[in-house]
Amino acid sequence: KHAHEYAAEQLFAPLGITNTHWKTTPTGLADTEGGLYLTARDLAKLGYLYLKDGVWDGRRILPEGWVARSTTPLIDTRPGQPRSRKYGYQWWVLPTRDGATTAYAALGYGGQRLIVVPELEIVAVFTGWNIYEHPEFAPYAALDRILAAVSP
Protein backbone atom coordinates (compact mmCIF):
# COMPACT_ATOMS: atom_id res chain seq x y z
CA LYS A 1 0.00 0.00 0.00
CA HIS A 2 1.02 3.58 -0.53
CA ALA A 3 1.63 5.70 2.58
CA HIS A 4 -1.49 7.82 2.06
CA GLU A 5 -3.69 4.71 1.75
CA TYR A 6 -2.19 3.13 4.85
CA ALA A 7 -2.57 6.36 6.85
CA ALA A 8 -6.18 6.77 5.71
CA GLU A 9 -7.10 3.25 6.86
CA GLN A 10 -4.97 2.74 9.95
CA LEU A 11 -4.65 6.25 11.36
CA PHE A 12 -7.16 8.74 9.98
CA ALA A 13 -10.27 6.53 9.89
CA PRO A 14 -10.04 5.48 13.58
CA LEU A 15 -9.62 9.16 14.55
CA GLY A 16 -12.56 10.29 12.43
CA ILE A 17 -10.31 12.31 10.12
CA THR A 18 -11.95 12.45 6.70
CA ASN A 19 -10.90 15.77 5.17
CA THR A 20 -7.24 15.42 4.19
CA HIS A 21 -5.04 16.42 1.30
CA TRP A 22 -1.58 15.03 0.75
CA LYS A 23 0.65 16.59 -1.87
CA THR A 24 2.23 14.07 -4.17
CA THR A 25 5.67 13.78 -5.68
CA PRO A 26 6.16 13.79 -9.45
CA THR A 27 6.05 9.97 -9.30
CA GLY A 28 2.64 10.04 -7.59
CA LEU A 29 3.73 9.11 -4.07
CA ALA A 30 2.59 10.98 -0.96
CA ASP A 31 4.94 13.80 0.05
CA THR A 32 5.40 12.34 3.53
CA GLU A 33 8.09 14.79 4.62
CA GLY A 34 5.60 17.62 4.92
CA GLY A 35 2.87 17.71 2.32
CA LEU A 36 -0.10 16.76 4.52
CA TYR A 37 -2.95 19.23 4.93
CA LEU A 38 -5.38 18.81 7.86
CA THR A 39 -7.88 21.00 9.65
CA ALA A 40 -6.76 22.41 13.00
CA ARG A 41 -9.18 20.06 14.78
CA ASP A 42 -7.80 17.01 12.97
CA LEU A 43 -4.22 18.06 13.64
CA ALA A 44 -5.17 18.34 17.32
CA LYS A 45 -6.49 14.76 17.17
CA LEU A 46 -3.02 13.57 16.16
CA GLY A 47 -1.55 15.51 19.08
CA TYR A 48 -4.09 14.01 21.46
CA LEU A 49 -3.31 10.53 20.13
CA TYR A 50 0.34 11.14 21.00
CA LEU A 51 -0.57 12.65 24.37
CA LYS A 52 -2.44 9.43 25.19
CA ASP A 53 0.48 7.20 24.10
CA GLY A 54 -1.17 6.02 20.88
CA VAL A 55 -4.55 5.08 22.37
CA TRP A 56 -7.75 6.64 21.00
CA ASP A 57 -11.12 6.04 22.64
CA GLY A 58 -9.79 2.94 24.40
CA ARG A 59 -8.29 1.45 21.22
CA ARG A 60 -4.57 1.21 20.55
CA ILE A 61 -3.88 2.92 17.21
CA LEU A 62 -0.09 3.27 17.38
CA PRO A 63 2.18 0.39 18.38
CA GLU A 64 3.16 0.18 22.03
CA GLY A 65 6.28 2.26 22.62
CA TRP A 66 6.02 4.17 19.32
CA VAL A 67 5.28 7.55 20.90
CA ALA A 68 8.29 7.31 23.21
CA ARG A 69 10.58 6.15 20.39
CA SER A 70 9.40 8.77 17.91
CA THR A 71 9.77 11.65 20.36
CA THR A 72 13.18 10.57 21.64
CA PRO A 73 15.87 12.93 20.33
CA LEU A 74 18.15 11.41 17.73
CA ILE A 75 19.84 14.59 16.50
CA ASP A 76 20.85 17.77 18.31
CA THR A 77 20.55 20.56 15.75
CA ARG A 78 22.45 23.14 17.82
CA PRO A 79 24.79 21.26 20.19
CA GLY A 80 25.93 23.15 23.25
CA GLN A 81 23.56 26.06 22.75
CA PRO A 82 20.83 26.98 25.23
CA ARG A 83 17.48 25.44 24.42
CA SER A 84 18.96 23.46 21.59
CA ARG A 85 16.29 21.85 19.44
CA LYS A 86 16.58 18.13 19.04
CA TYR A 87 14.88 15.96 16.46
CA GLY A 88 13.24 12.54 16.63
CA TYR A 89 11.08 10.80 14.02
CA GLN A 90 9.52 13.93 12.44
CA TRP A 91 9.11 15.51 15.90
CA TRP A 92 11.10 18.44 17.24
CA VAL A 93 11.89 18.00 20.94
CA LEU A 94 11.85 21.36 22.72
CA PRO A 95 13.04 21.98 26.27
CA THR A 96 11.16 24.67 28.15
CA ARG A 97 12.87 27.85 29.28
CA ASP A 98 13.44 26.48 32.79
CA GLY A 99 14.39 23.03 31.50
CA ALA A 100 11.86 21.37 33.82
CA THR A 101 9.48 20.24 31.08
CA THR A 102 9.92 18.96 27.56
CA ALA A 103 7.50 19.46 24.72
CA TYR A 104 7.51 17.95 21.28
CA ALA A 105 6.26 19.63 18.17
CA ALA A 106 5.45 19.07 14.53
CA LEU A 107 6.46 22.27 12.78
CA GLY A 108 5.07 23.00 9.35
CA TYR A 109 5.85 25.54 6.68
CA GLY A 110 4.46 29.01 7.20
CA GLY A 111 3.69 28.68 10.89
CA GLN A 112 1.66 25.47 11.13
CA ARG A 113 2.38 24.04 14.57
CA LEU A 114 1.29 21.11 16.69
CA ILE A 115 2.80 21.32 20.16
CA VAL A 116 2.33 18.61 22.80
CA VAL A 117 3.36 19.10 26.44
CA PRO A 118 2.72 15.67 28.02
CA GLU A 119 3.52 16.65 31.61
CA LEU A 120 0.81 19.32 31.51
CA GLU A 121 -1.57 17.39 29.21
CA ILE A 122 -1.53 20.20 26.65
CA VAL A 123 -2.12 19.89 22.93
CA ALA A 124 -1.91 23.19 21.05
CA VAL A 125 -2.42 23.83 17.35
CA PHE A 126 -1.48 26.97 15.46
CA THR A 127 -2.31 27.58 11.83
CA GLY A 128 -1.29 30.45 9.67
CA TRP A 129 0.69 31.41 6.67
CA ASN A 130 3.61 33.54 7.76
CA ILE A 131 6.30 32.30 5.41
CA TYR A 132 8.61 35.12 6.41
CA GLU A 133 8.90 34.39 10.12
CA HIS A 134 12.28 33.65 11.60
CA PRO A 135 12.18 29.84 12.03
CA GLU A 136 14.56 29.73 14.98
CA PHE A 137 12.32 31.61 17.41
CA ALA A 138 8.70 30.87 16.59
CA PRO A 139 8.42 27.39 18.20
CA TYR A 140 9.88 28.64 21.46
CA ALA A 141 7.75 31.79 21.44
CA ALA A 142 4.62 29.66 21.09
CA LEU A 143 5.73 27.21 23.79
CA ASP A 144 6.66 30.02 26.19
CA ARG A 145 3.26 31.68 25.74
CA ILE A 146 1.41 28.41 26.28
CA LEU A 147 3.29 27.69 29.50
CA ALA A 148 2.85 31.26 30.75
CA ALA A 149 -0.90 30.95 30.23
CA VAL A 150 -1.18 27.83 32.40
CA SER A 151 1.39 28.69 35.08
CA PRO A 152 0.10 29.67 38.51
What positions do the PLM features span?
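Structural helix-adjacent loops and short alpha-helical linkers that scaffold large soluble proteins
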Residues: K1-A8, G54-L62, P135-E136
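Active-site helix/loop module of the DD-peptidase/beta-lactamase fold
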Residues: K1-G34, L38
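Non-transmembrane alpha-helical segments in soluble domains
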Residues: H4-A8, F12, A44-L51, V67, ...
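Active-site Gly/Thr loop motif
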Residues: I17-T20, A68-V123
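A beta-strand-loop signature enriched in Asp, Gly, Thr, and Trp
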Residues: W22-E33, D53-P82
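Active-site rim elements
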Residues: A30-G34, A103, Y132
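Active-site-proximal alpha-helical segments within enzyme catalytic domains
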Residues: G34-V55, Q112-W129
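Structured C-terminal helix/loop/strand segments within mature extracytoplasmic catalytic/sensor domains
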Residues: A106-P152
